[in-house]
Amino acid sequence: MPLSSIHTLPLEKLRNNLSSEGYKAFHASQVFNWVYKLRQSNWDQMTNLSLDLRSYLKENLLATQLVKKREVFLEDQETVKFLWQLSDNMLVESVLIYSEGRRTVCVSSQVGCPARCAFCASGKNGLKRNLTAAEIFEQVYQIDLWLLERKEKVSH
């Protein structure tokens, strides 16, 4: 069975999951603090969690399910395209658009497209599947991490 993403779990459900495995409920808040406030997606870097808990998290939850395959600045230097590989090896793109005072992310919500427009590559092979909410969210999350390295953040 594929692992679930941390981004699919509400805090209360993570508390219940951890408690049922013998961990303290407050550990869920620590995990959420690492993931959503400190923007850490590597379980090993969550140093205030025990090694045992980090091992449990690695075995049972994905901290990230998108793998960045490519990032390309377009000629206008105001647009960056990201190519992501999903856990089923399908590929999707996201676009970061720089504009005056804004950092806007355009996300994919599907693999492929049913429209098959002649001018668009997305529909050439038809619609493969809809993305999960976690896969859609993680596109924004990952691009925000990319921007944070540059002392910026997503605004739209």
Predicted regions: what they are:
Residues M1-R103:
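Flexible, acidic/Gly-rich N-terminal and inter-domain linker regions that tether
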Residues M90-S94, E100-S108, G112-H156:
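Conserved Radical SAM active-site core
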